[in-house]
Amino acid sequence: KTFVQSELSEAEIRAGLAADAIRLVYQPKVDAVSLDMVGVEALLRWETLDGTLLGPGAVVPVAERSGLMFALTQAIFTTAMAQLSQWCQAGYRWKVSCNFSVSDLTESSIVRVLDDALAVSGAPAELVILEVTESKLPEDVSRVMSSLTRMRLKGCGISIDDFGTGFSSMEQLRRFPFTELKIDRAFVNGAHSMPSSKAIFESSVDLARRLGISSVAEGVEDEADLTLCRSLGVDLIQGFYIARPMFPEAVVEWAIKRGH
C-alpha cells in the first residue's frame, strides 16, 4: 500500500465512514531515560477503494468544514478503544492517546459517546489519554472544560497537544484538568543548536514539572534530540528516532523485539 496526501470530497468521507475506511496506526511513546514503551498515539489513515492510504490532512479539514468531524472522531475513538482492549487481553497495558478537536468537545453527547466506546470495548479508562490541541481551544471554554472534567473524573488522562503554539497557554493550564503537557516538535527537533527553541523547550519541561504533570517531547528525530530531552528531564518522548507510526501487529512485534 502506498501513502499519499490528497484531499477527499465530503461525499467520499461519508461513503468511507459507512464502509469502514478508517485505518489507525500507532506511534510509540517511551520513557526518556529507560526507553521502555509506555503508550502509543493513535493516528488516522484512510484507506480508499484501491488500497491507497491517505493521511489525516486529506480527511480532517474536509470533515471539519462539512460537519463530519464528530462522526469521524467517534469512529476513530471506537476503533482505538477496541484495539486497546485487544492489547490488554494479550497482556499489554499501554496507554492509548487519541486526538480530539474542539468541535468534538463542544458536542453535548461527547461524554456519552466516549462512555459507550469504553463500555462496548471493555477498555480501561485509566489507559486512555485525550489529546487536545492548544492552538484550537476556543475563547468560550465552559463546554469544553465540562467535557474534559467529566472524562478526567472517569479516569482518562488529558493532554494539551502542540504546547507552545497557541496564545493563552498559561490560562489554559490553570483552568483545564491536564495531566500531560506535550511540547510541539517545533521546539524539540534541533533545539540543541537553536538557543531560542531550547529556552522554550526547557521552560515548558520545567513548567510541567512544577505543575505536577507529565512532559512529552514529540519530534525526537536523532541522538542529539534524545540527549537534550534527557538532560532537561523530559518524562516521555515520541518521534521517528524511536519509532515511526505502525499498524497494531507491528507495534507488538516492535515491543517484543525491545523486550517489552
Predicted regions and their residues:
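Catalytic-core regions built around general acid/base machinery
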Residues: 114-117, 146-154
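Active-site core of bacterial EAL-family cyclic-dinucleotide phosphodiesterase domains
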Residues: 2-62, 99, 160, 238, ...
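Conserved long alpha-helical elements within nucleotide-processing catalytic cores of c-di-GMP signaling
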Residues: 60-61, 70, 149, 198
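EAL-family c-di-GMP phosphodiesterase catalytic domain
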Residues: 1-2, 32, 36, 49, ...
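Hydrophobic side chains in well-ordered alpha-helices of soluble proteins
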Residues: 42, 59, 76, 80, ...
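Catalytic core of bacterial c-di-GMP phosphodiesterases, primarily the EAL and HD-GYP domains
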Residues: 34-41, 66-143, 219
